Amino acid sequence: MSKTVVLAEKPSVGRDLARVLKCHKKGNGYLEGDRYIVTWALGHLVTLADPEGYGKEYQSWRLEDLPIIPEPLKLVVIKKTGKQFQAVKSQLIRKDVKDIVIATDAGREGELVARWIIEKAKVTKPLKRLWISSVTDKAIKDGFKNLKNGKDFENLYHSAVARAEADWIVGINATRALTTKFNAQLSCGRVQTPTLAMIAKREEDIKNFKPVPYFGLRAAVDGMTLTWQDKKTSQTRTFNASVTSQLAGALQGKPAVIVDLKKTAKKSFAPGLYDLTELQRDAHKRFGFSAKETLSVLQKLYEQHKLVTYPRTDSRFLSNDIVPTLKDRLEGMQVKPYAQHVARILKRGVKANKSFVNDAKVSDHHAIIPTEEPLALGALSEKERKLYDLIAKRFLAVLMPPFEYEETKVFAEIGGETFTAKGKTVQSQGWKAVYDFADEDDDEEEKDQTLPKLAKGDTLSVRSLTETKGETKPPARFNEGTLLSAMENPAAFMQGEEKNLVKTLGETGGLGTVATRADIIEKLFNTFLIEKKGKDIYITSKGKQLLELVPSDLKSPALTAEWEQKLSGIAKGKLKSSAFIKEMKEYAKQTIREIKSSNQKFKHDNITGTHCPDCGKLMLKVNGKRGTMLVCQDRECGHRKTVAKQTNARCPVCHKRMELRGHGEGQTFACVCGHREKLSVFEKRRAKDKNSKASKRDVHSYMKKQNKDEPINNALAEQLKKLKLDQ
């Protein structure tokens, strides 16, 4: 009997598919049943070969070897996951296997993961496609009843290959050229470089900003505060100090006369459902999660707990075919604290509308919403609960009536000058009943008040007149949340660019994709092009210099717009990938010529007096997310060591987080308040604390892990939190 291989992207999804398809026989990297063999990748198992794969001469980075443009680009098995590739291949080539179901993530990258494996295995069997947005049993069963023809996704695959090859051709060549030309570890790319340029522009805007003072006037009357309004501009502030100071004197002792009351019934609708970027923004704003951390937690909610739909979506809408499933999803989350809201929605009846259901605004995947899986909050970690709560409340909110209120605008005159106040009377909480936080987006200077009973013609005595003043503020520095927003909508950083390119970036979702933006930000941190101070992101000297060295069009989002426009054309079958790749090769050659002819120099302004123990050259001091490091300036040497690490250990004096400095016996905790404490003293102090759950072994284990130079934004910090070291 012939069988079908089902290729998943990850083991966890593979196990779910195998369970539904009744594949219980365990093999080496696969599960087998009567009809199906389920196997899985581990993300990418196959990738494009590095330059040294085309010849030993490319093992050394030399400017004279550039550009490197192999014909054709070769695929290689990733060494780290080579065993799993062989396990997958052995199933694909079986004689009893008649066809293959691609069950990797439903999107451009998922298509590439599977197709590259199949191509490298030299298998040409018929392909079918599983295209689902959640991995619940019901979704899997429905998906297998409606498998799509693999040929329908050929263009999507060609688009994915074109993107990967273009990134290789431009990225590899530009990075090697910059690094060898300026003898510094420099990298660039079509997404990371314009992202860095946006951070630099924001820094420049802040630096050049000149604050302008402004002035206002407030009148305190019985039961409310009135705000002066300029009759000419209708503004509640002026940049002329003499205007308000003269008014404050002239209006003293004069009453306020109510000249008009305007009452307006208003409705406020719930914010849209979450796509990945919006969820990352909110999670950073409310919980301080990094973009990568949010995606990691979300992936667990999707794969492990099966409580939410596909995470890497760029849509904030649902398609019409999802509407009949909304009732089941609501019933799955009928536990506290959501049960009362679910009951109210079900009693009223589930009503969909165009504000969140629109087929035209759903491409590969709909918005992130709960699945019908029964909710067990006790099985979730604290972070998983927080993230699920955001998704659940947003889902409930769009299914609830609008928030309704009556807005009252008061117009009064004092000595012929106009003063205003406004108040709000809630008629129906609607969707706001789901939330227990106040509006955070109300930035208006004139706040809503609880107004007394008033009538037109009323005369009120003015108890006091107060002059107010402030200054215009510079643009805020980026944090990870606002940087994600800028990457999604970079139009403000494309002044002077063609309108069609700005429009394209808007249509294609900006710089990068929902799935790659977190990694791009992380790479900028890891390569020390940007750094964090608190939550704010700053460009480093290295980042500023890099932008001076790269060709100008690599800094503009317009390059990404042009590429995405063409990649979209390839995916739709309107453009041949070969024409696009030919253009990218010419672009790479031009970029190399520009870099080679540059007369600029790169200056290490973070050089120290410490010599590298491996090569003897002076080392550079760099600030990472987890602390301070010394890195050898010789890129080929690559020696690095951590000299100060940020920890979660709290200072016994001010309770702020302490930094760990030094090595071995001499390691010392240091705090910004001036407190110093040797590691040995720290251990003794904690050992005395009978209530602490941190044993000496716990502390030593933590310190051992701290010494590893791991990528930033890892989970190490979480370990110390659990040890209760802030007692």
Swiss-Prot record:
Catalytic activity: ATP-independent breakage of single-stranded DNA, followed by passage and rejoining
Domain Toprim: 3-136
Gene Ontology CC: cytoplasmic replication fork
Cofactor: Mg(2+)
Disulfide cross-links: none
Xref: PROSITE patterns: TOPO_IA_1, TOPO_IA_2, TOPRIM
Residue ranges constituting the Topo IA-type catalytic domain according to the UniProt record: 153-592
Function: Releases the supercoiling and torsional tension of DNA, which is introduced during the DNA replication and transcription, by transiently cleaving and rejoining one strand of the DNA duplex. Introduces a single-strand break via transesterification at a target site in duplex DNA. The scissile phosphodiester is attacked by the catalytic tyrosine of the enzyme, resulting in the formation of a DNA-(5'-phosphotyrosyl)-enzyme intermediate and the expulsion of a 3'-OH DNA strand. The free DNA strand then undergoes passage around the unbroken strand, thus removing DNA supercoils.
Protein name: DNA topoisomerase 3
Protein's organism: Bacillus licheniformis (strain ATCC 14580 / DSM 13 / JCM 2505 / CCUG 7422 / NBRC 12200 / NCIMB 9375 / NCTC 10341 / NRRL NRS-1264 / Gibson 46)
Designated gene of the protein: topB
